[in-house]
């Protein structure tokens, strides 16, 4: 079965002067899940004239940091392609919208964590590890978590900033065993097992996105408290299914206490299940 390739695409040709709004879907999903929201946005003439809508698709079973690398590099390539001379200020006002796991990818575009990631993952400097240069370069790319200078606004929908209790469940971890990782990641794992005991431990704790979104995982422990970079405005849309105290509510997949983060400009709580992007 052919693996889904990470890619960034637009529904229409690039239009100068319109700010890209990039939608990033969640686990076991696809860009098609944004259809209802997209229809609503396109029916608003004011929004339609101000924004152009792009979509990022990826294999959601891959490690979160690996998928974030693909998103980061896709955005950088796209902007360099559509605005070669740097003459369109609209592309430097990018809006990112992420649902569920997609929200984690979005946040990784708006925080500076490279130094902490290197310290947490590696017991010795990357340059001192004995491994093929190809593997070393892939690690550099994966941990290069720096706020992209053209991202100005991020919107989180039902995002498990502190992990999902569903991802931490027995069934999820059994299913994660069947995830087929990209060849790059498999080779990286093999090389690392022979070079760095600390990184070996991190890798053996689980490579798939399911493990990365487990409450208490190294990734969410580091990412949840990380502040958005200066100049980036954040918004949270959090779904709950009940009417009880928010700290006890969930959307069936993500608890309110996981979706809530400090430092955002606004937080809207709606009554919905986890697939809030398809509800009106």
Language model features by range: what are they?
Residues 21-27, 56-207, 251:
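Serine-dependent carboxylesterase/thioesterase catalytic core
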Residues 1-22, 30-36, 52-55, 82, ...:
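Flexible, membrane-associating and regulatory peripheral segments of lipid-active enzymes
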Residues 171-280:
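C-terminal catalytic-base region of ester-bond hydrolases, centering on the histidine
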Residues 12, 16, 144-153, 206-220:
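Alpha-helix-centered segments that form part of catalytic cores
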């Amino acid at each position: 079965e052919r693996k889904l390739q990470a890619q960034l695409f637009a529904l229409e040709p690039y239009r100068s002067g319109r700010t890209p709004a990039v939608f990033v879907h969640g686990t076991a999903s696809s860009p098609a899940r944004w259809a209802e929201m997209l229809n609503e946005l396109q029916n608003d003439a004011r929004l339609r004239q101000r924004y152009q809508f792009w979509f990022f698709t990826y294999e959601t079973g891959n490690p979160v940091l690996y998928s974030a690398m693909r998103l980061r590099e896709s955005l950088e390539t796209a902007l360099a392609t559509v605005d070669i001379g740097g003459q369109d200020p609209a592309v430097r006002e990018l809006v990112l919208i992420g649902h569920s796991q997609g929200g984690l990818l979005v946040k990784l575009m708006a925080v500076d964590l490279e130094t902490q990631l290197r310290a947490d993952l590696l017991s010795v400097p990357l340059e001192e590890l004995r491994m093929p240069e190809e593997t070393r370069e892939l690690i550099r790319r994966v941990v290069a978590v720096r706020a992209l200078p053209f991202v100005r606004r991020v919107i989180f929908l039902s995002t498990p900033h502190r992990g999902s209790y569903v991802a931490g469940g027995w069934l999820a971890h059994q299913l994660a065993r069947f995830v087929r990782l990209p060849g790059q990641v498999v080779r990286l794992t093999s090389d690392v097992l022979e070079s760095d005991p600390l990184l070996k431990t991190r890798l053996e704790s689980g490579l798939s996105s399911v493990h990365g979104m487990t409450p208490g995982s190294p990734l969410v422990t580091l990412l949840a408290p990380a502040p958005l970079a200066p100049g980036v405005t954040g918004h949270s849309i959090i779904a709950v299914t009940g009417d009880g105290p928010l700290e006890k509510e969930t959307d069936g997949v993500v608890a309110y206490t996981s979706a809530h983060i400090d430092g955002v400009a606004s937080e809207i709580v709606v009554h919905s299940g986890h697939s809030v992007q398809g509800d009106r």
